[in-house]
């Protein structure tokens, strides 16, 4: 049966089983493709022409921001490549469409380093001032999480998905399964970070084994993205920090700090798990303070004397 809805279901199963995409990506694909199916009003994919796609894209531009439209088009385009690959359609209507975007560059938001230090200080202070063992253990785990976010640039989804077998604290190495099931290895280069992770693992060992995730609640359940976000908000409030801090901002700060320290951008790309260096290059626009330092201290005009 050549039904668009049936092919969408088959494609999502293919993405899960063959392409091994993560649940969040598949969820986004599902939303985009079901929306497309509901709007297009054509049940047979063979009858969808370039004109139909162009009209649909025009409608999306009226409803969504360019970034959202780009993502939705990418979802639909990947689906039609699948239909072509499976010989379900003879011609891909996307082949006759030229899509151009001019998006404003949105720079990653970073956390000033003095605020990162203040944030970490607050967590350690809460731990030392804890009145109950429960509070003390929570603060220990929270310190381990924030230290890892800042010291490795790991994504929050990657952190929450870490298994006990992915973390080798003897050698200070973490195996990360990133976007698209891409593997990368990260080193823990700071001894203080390594020590707090070891202390956390020893204290939470039973809970970690119980849920098979490295970061666990005290009831032995894996930590969710949302629970980490709530924890970040809690310590930002306790620190009296007048800045909305998200877990991903630690990743941006990690990358920008390394770039400002003259680390080769290709090393940063590898550590962040970016598929293209073009993605990493966004951080070159952020390092304004480094640019100023270079122009003050490196430009030859400073040696001119009249």
Swiss-Prot record:
GO MF term list: DNA binding
Biological role stated in the UniProt entry? Site-specific tyrosine recombinase, which acts by catalyzing the cutting and rejoining of the recombining DNA molecules.
Question: Top-down, what is the taxonomic lineage of the species of origin?
Answer: Bacteria, Bacillati, Bacillota, Clostridia, Lachnospirales
Signal peptide extent: none
Which family is it part of? Belongs to the 'phage' integrase family.
Q: Which organism is it from?
A: Agathobacter rectalis (strain ATCC 33656 / DSM 3377 / JCM 17463 / KCTC 5835 / VPI 0990) (Eubacterium rectale)
Which keywords describe this protein according to UniProt? Cell cycle, Cell division, Chromosome partition, Cytoplasm, DNA integration, DNA recombination, DNA-binding
Q: Which domain of life is it from?
A: Bacteria
Q: Where in or outside the cell?
A: Cytoplasm
Keyword DNA-binding (UniProt): yes
Q: Which GO terms describe its cellular component?
A: cytoplasm
What is annotated as the active site?
155, 179, 248, 251, 274, 283 (o-(3'-phospho-dna)-tyrosine intermediate)
**Where does the Core-binding (CB) domain lie?**
2-84
Task: Enumerate the spans annotated as Tyr recombinase domain.
Answer: 106-296
A Pfam family assignment: Phage_integrase
Q: What is this protein called?
A: Tyrosine recombinase EUBREC_2677
Main localization is cytoplasm
Q: What are the GO BP annotations of this UniProt entry? A: cell division; chromosome segregation; DNA integration; DNA recombination
